[in-house]
Swiss-Prot record:
UniProt name for this protein: Cytochrome P450 monooxygenase ltmJ
Primary gene name: ltmJ
Higher taxonomy: Eukaryota, Fungi, Dikarya, Ascomycota, Pezizomycotina
Coarse class of the protein's main subcellular location: membrane
Family membership noted in the UniProt record: Belongs to the cytochrome P450 family.
A Pfam family matched in the record: p450
Cellular component GO terms, alphabetical: membrane
EC supergroup of this enzyme: oxidoreductase
Organism of this sequence: Epichloe festucae var. lolii (Neotyphodium lolii)
Transport recorded as keyword: no
E.C. no: 1.-.-.-
Amino acid sequence: MAFASLLHHIWNHAVDCAEQLTWWQTIVSFIIFCIMCSWLPGNGEMRAPFVGYRWPFEPTFWVRMRFIFQSLGMMTEGYSKFKDSMFKITTNDADWLVLSQRYLDDLQSLPAERLSHTDALVTMWGSSHSPFALLNKSDLSSRALRDVVAPNYAKDLDSLVDELRYSLEHDIDIQDDWKPIDALELSSKLVLRISQRILIGWPMSRDQELLECAQGYADAATVVQFALKLLPRQIRPLVYPLLPQAWATKSWIRRCDKILAKEMQRRQVLEKSDPVYEKPKDLLQGMVDLEPSRPVDKLGHDFLVQALISRMAPVVTMAQTLVDLALHPEDIEELRDEVLQVIGPDGAGLGNLRQSFTKLDKMDSVLRESARFTPLSMMTMHRRVQDAKGITLHDGVHLPRGTHVAFPAYHIGRDPKLVSGADIYDGLRWYRKDLGEAQENEAPKHRFVTPDSNYLTFGSGKYVCPGRFIAEHMLKLMMTAVLLRYEFKWPPGVPVPEQQYRHVFAYPSKTTLLIKRRKDGDQIL
């Protein structure tokens, strides 16, 4: 009791002192605290050169803050000096060890017990004090996506066509005259509908309340994620509960819990009363079947986090691809002709979409080129060493436990020694390369979803992104519809946007295009 009284007295005294501080004193105190936090060790045991410091005594907290807005320049400096070895970047999340691609074979197949991808992703996405921290507590939604959704969704691609048509008719307002449309907003609306159809099926894919939950949670979680990245990780536990968006995420989760519980009750009634009822192979059903002990009214958080993760790459990739095509209009007709040839003027190819999509070689090339030229994340294959003994690489370099490693996907894809003409966007680059290298009856090697040592958008090895085929089918379906239904171009007189990154994430600064309907464009899809 005496100790509790002492703590209470100290707390009250601290509050009284804080109330007497002026704004200037508060700001100075915060800066001093940040400087003190910057002295705390990161991956201090791992010896490698740091990059990003403009002068020897630049405060570390300031370097970490600059990384949020100047990460591309810092990474370019590091890659130009140490691309054949390794270097360190300091961030508010952790100190990251950026590795040369020659270490891929050492790490890409190690088990999670030795090299965790989940721990590293949680750190990269905003630390343990963010909505994504759930991934360290529960892998239920990830297992359901990998084991239930991914193997089964393609059996009913016709349903995605139905959902896409519904979205184009109800969510998108494009007329016969040229009209400015934000490509990011367009892709976000389409992806939201289609991803919901994949993750929870019909009729819930059109449940307006669930759609609002998915979008509302995504908006709030994204704000929380980037707000926390501005702060030293030592004070995130204090700030996180004070963010209005943090409270909003919890509100959306509670609403989603109720919606999913009601849907599971409906399914359970059907399962008992309808002898021909078949359980859907979607995310919700997968989570329930994989973990029957979990209360059905406690699945909202898992569902919303997985829904957000599943949408991020398709939304940005779709928008970036449309921008790239608008800036290189010579590729648009090439793609449109290919789509018409594969789908057919009467839409016969829609009857077997899975097979039709494998024939869209030029579209594969354009998607891959956009992902190479402007990857969603500047660094991929984030991993955290979990092995208590650490990990020793092939050349004797030792990675101690706790080391956060990643590979510079952006700069590997832009390295002229690895990719010819790497600084030039060439939409049909991979199509021509496959034509030149392919043997008789050999499938193309440079698909959008096919990773290799020079193309790490989806990672590599044992933990390559399990949802990449879902993303591929979503993107090809949406691109097919846009090419058939609409004309689009870059607005005349608007300068070409510079590539920008915030932290490690692509930040499309200008995505507004001019779009109009094509005559009879909706007759096929």
